[in-house]
Amino acid sequence: MIKYLKKAIEKPQEDITAVQETVREILAKIKNEGEAGLRFYSEKFDNWSPKSFRVSEDEIRAAKSKLPATEVEDIDFCQAQIRNFAQEQMKRLVDFEVETVPGVHLGQKIIPVSCSGSYIPGGRYPMLASAHMTVITPKVAGVSRVVACSPPVKGQGLWPATLYSMVAGGADEIYCMGGVHALAAMAYGIEGLQPVDMMVGAGNKYVAEAKRQLFGTVGIDLLAGPTEILIIADDTADPFIVAADILGQAEHDPNARQALVALSASIAEKTMKEVDRQLVDLPTKDIAAVAWRDNGEVIVVDSPEEAVKVSDDWAPEHLEVQTEDWKYYLDNCKNYGSAFLGEETTVAYGDKTIGTNHVLPTMKAARYTGGLSVGKFVKTVTYQYATKEASYKIADVCERACNYENMLAHGISCKVRKDKYAK
């Protein structure tokens, strides 16, 4: 039986009509006016009107010199892990060709998109990991032109660490611009910036809405909502660590969602007490406490099977398993963005360092999609060719199949081949 010790507060669905209209106006102005429209919104929202929005070679060369050696080493380490895992993913996306019947050859080719745009948020804080995840991954996939943009810091250009991360990740063009106007510039193109084929990266609700409205003009990765974590824990789990991981996600956003699925009331109650204790001294408690109060859930279940059901219903962005037998959950849980198995891993590792991508589905989207990977930046295309003898045999069946659907011109395209290749 499933029992709630703590439930999230039910909130009315937010009316985003005003957000949609604001985004629509920004997109239209930049589509129609180009750089003039971009400059208008950059001045309005970011107090930023540089001679050129593209970051200069001098700025790029200077970025590394502004950072402590340890920070550079750490960035390089994190990027190496992300690159290594992406390369392993890429090895498993392969071309192939097969002869399905004598004389009929079918094949698959993996072709990278020509150009992608990476949006790295961070006007308030440097979001280094977002640069790692959204720049390195397309480069490993073989994208020849990767455009990266990030908002200015209080009218002073990019964070040096963010800029270095973009450069080290392999970005081909870097622009200092943020928000909806940055996405519009990448999608439609402006003077000196050719449009991209797809865009990836997270942001606020305006950025998410812009991606939704631009989908079709460009491809997108996914529409991200507030971050989520669901932790499955049994009595072997350490309440101190479980609580720390809950708060690690809660500090993201007052709307962040957290759930503990406990296999006993004991671990549930101990963890709740530990969350309250850790919140007292947490530097980010102003955000984390609100997220936990409003959106935190604690659910006690009787069995691993019930835990799997709750988890799959949630379809969390991040799934942590802190149980004696985490392999059971790896084998049976189906809906999640990324799984962190055992006490020895934590969401923070995946967010920043360990190598898996942190751009993950939220809002139950894990029911039908995974997170960002090299696979998002390639097209799986197919081809076919046949001998004359095989074409003759296929044409006879295909002509009838077309006629069953009253697609008569289709049928004729088969018949002319049947007639031509008749023995």
Language model segments and positions:
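N-terminal Rossmann-like NAD(P)+-binding subdomain of aldehyde/semialdehyde dehydrogenases
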Residues: 1-114
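A conserved active-site cap/scaffold subdomain adjacent to cofactor or substrate pockets
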Residues: 222-294, 298
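C-terminal core of ALDH-fold dehydrogenases
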Residues: 304, 312-423
